């Protein structure tokens, strides 16, 4: 999916945090970005917590050089405080993130939306499946404004997945998560 989306150095990748400390989307995507040798990535995430500690080596090696978020906790916060992030750490409220994206101040090249359920056409819902989280409100702005949008799910459901929190008209690709087979 990263190749199909045209991933390259210097891009901004969008993520949300509906799964809280159970999120593995950021780690999974950034591991692949790192393996591809891509550098100078800006992560624009609604929040980053202890679940994302595995991306610290990518901060240290320059894979990730900027972070925009509502907050950072755990080892990411420690790495930023220790001066390991080569670029900027911009902290905004959730609404401030939405405003920055809607106004064009922040441009997301590729958004990765972890969704509890999704059909083959990309209709995403935060309800159902193994990872039920409610609505996908933090990710709606990513779906509407990112240049390319990828839905990642551990539960593909029959079309139509309705009512969709994020419509298939926003999506470019859907991708079953490795956890889809668990």
Enumerate the language-model features and the residues they cover:
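Conserved small/polar residues in nucleotide/adenosyl-binding loops
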Residues: 173-180
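N-terminal active-site beta-alpha-beta segment that forms phosphate/nucleotide-binding
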Residues: 1-78
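His/Asp/Glu-rich metal-coordinating catalytic cores
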Residues: 156-172
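Short acidic, glycine/serine/threonine-rich loops at helix termini
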Residues: 25-28, 54-60, 79-82, 123-129, ...
């Amino acid at each position: 999916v990263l190749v199909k989306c045209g991933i390259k150095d210097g891009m901004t990748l969008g993520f949300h945090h509906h799964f809280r400390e159970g999120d593995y989307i950021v780690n999974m995507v950034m591991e692949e970005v790192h393996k591809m040798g891509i550098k100078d990535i800006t992560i624009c995430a609604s929040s980053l917590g202890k679940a994302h500690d595995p991306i610290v080596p990518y901060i240290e090696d320059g894979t990730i050089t900027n972070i925009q978020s509502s907050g950072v906790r755990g080892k990411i916060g420690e790495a930023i405080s220790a001066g390991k992030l080569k670029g900027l750490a911009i902290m905004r409220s959730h609404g401030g993130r939405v405003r920055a994206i809607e106004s064009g101040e922040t441009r997301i090249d590729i958004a990765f939306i972890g969704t509890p359920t999704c059909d083959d056409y990309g209709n995403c819902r935060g309800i159902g499946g193994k990872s039920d989280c409610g609505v996908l409100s933090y990710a709606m702005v990513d779906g509407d404004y990112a240049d390319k949008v990828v839905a990642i799910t551990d539960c593909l459901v029959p079309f139509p997945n309705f009512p969709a929190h994020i419509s298939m008209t926003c999506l470019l690709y859907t991708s079953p998560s490795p956890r889809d087979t668990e």
